[in-house]
A protein has these predicted regions:
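Conserved catalytic core of the tyrosine transesterase superfamily
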Residues: 1-314
Length: 314
């Protein structure tokens, strides 16, 4: 059996039992593009290693690819599609210390201001109000891209300013209050009436100019192009280019900074932020506390104030 057919059957199987299976499906399709349409049994360990480790570094992405391929080949072995797995059994230690791009206020202003001109080009399939509202939602509510693109019309209440996230990671649905500015932007962006029939859910909130659902890759490529057009680049000394998902990280970091500056008890506020972001564990939220120097500085200042107060009472 060819690799493409085996992947298609494997994805169909997992989705038929109720799994969304989006991440593994995307990784396996990337593997298919890397290898080409070859016989499943002809793929060697060297080919797999080249896909896993293009830059000779073991990263969290390496682990995700490894897991997806390992499960795929285990499935193939149990069904007699392949005799053995070419995926390396040993899992090296992760060497990546990834620091996301935390957007400054100026960068956010440039990105939002540049949307209208950028999306006015003839080849752009996403209308400017739609793309601007999507960026505002990702930053203003800290949503994951998949959560935003899966929103349906009935899940966004523009009257009360509430957004219901059903298609969430870890299947943790949550309701989020949003401010009037974001609510207004979403109202302006409501998907246009389709100009031609499309095989799509009729209640999709974000849609392209023809009424079709927005593909993840189209949105990502549009954002990369917007960053280049508006001069938003990686920080000096960083190899990581700004990403859409970094809007979510920026939301969390900016919220924590605001709490510190307002004198709030950040440790008591963390569970609320964790719930708002849809994190499975509060430890996932706590990592933001050490993500950028400004947060560490604010935490240090808070500790110094506390320590001096304790000394003064002795």
């Amino acid at each position: 059996m060819t690799l493409g057919n085996a992947i298609a059957r494997y994805v169909d199987f997992n989705q038929s039992v109720g799994m969304r299976f989006q991440v593994d499906a995307a990784l396996l399709k990337a593997f298919h593009r890397h290898v080409g349409e070859v016989d499943l049994a002809a793929i060697s360990p060297d080919v797999v290693v080249a896909f896993l480790q293009p830059r000779h570094r073991v990263t969290s992405t390496w682990l995700m690819k490894h897991r997806a391929l390992r499960r795929f080949y285990q499935h193939g072995i149990t069904r007699g599609l392949v005799a053995c797995s070419p995926v390396p059994a040993a899992i090296p230690r992760v060497t990546e210390t990834f620091v996301p791009h935390i957007y400054s206020d100026e960068e956010l202003r440039r990105l939002l201001a540049g949307v209208a001109t950028h999306q006015a080009r003839a080849r752009c399939t996403i209308a400017a109000p739609t793309f601007r509202a999507l960026l505002l939602l990702l930053y203003g509510a800290g949503l994951r891209l998949g959560e935003a693109l899966a929103l349906r019309r009935e899940e966004v209440d523009l009257r009360t300013g509430m957004v219901l996230i059903r298609q969430a990671k870890f299947y943790k649905a949550r309701s989020l209050p949003i401010g009037p500015t974001l609510t207004q932007a979403l109202a302006v962006s409501v998907a246009p009436t389709p100009t031609r029939p499309r095989a799509m859910p009729p209640t999709t909130f974000f849609a392209n100019r023809s009424g079709g659902a927005l593909p993840h890759q189209t949105v990502r490529h549009t954002f990369v192009s917007l960053c280049a057009r508006t001069g938003v680049y990686a920080r000096a000394g960083s190899t990581a280019a700004p990403r859409l998902h970094d809007l979510r990280h920026s939301f969390a970091v900016h919220r924590l900074l605001a709490w510190y500056r307002e004198g709030a008890d950040v440790q008591r506020c963390l569970p609320h932020l964790s719930t708002y972001l849809g994190h499975a564990r509060i430890a996932c939220t706590q990592r933001y506390l050490t993500m950028i120097p400004e947060l560490l500085e604010q935490a240090s200042l808070r500790f110094e104030t506390y320590a001096h107060g304790e000394v003064g009472h002795e």
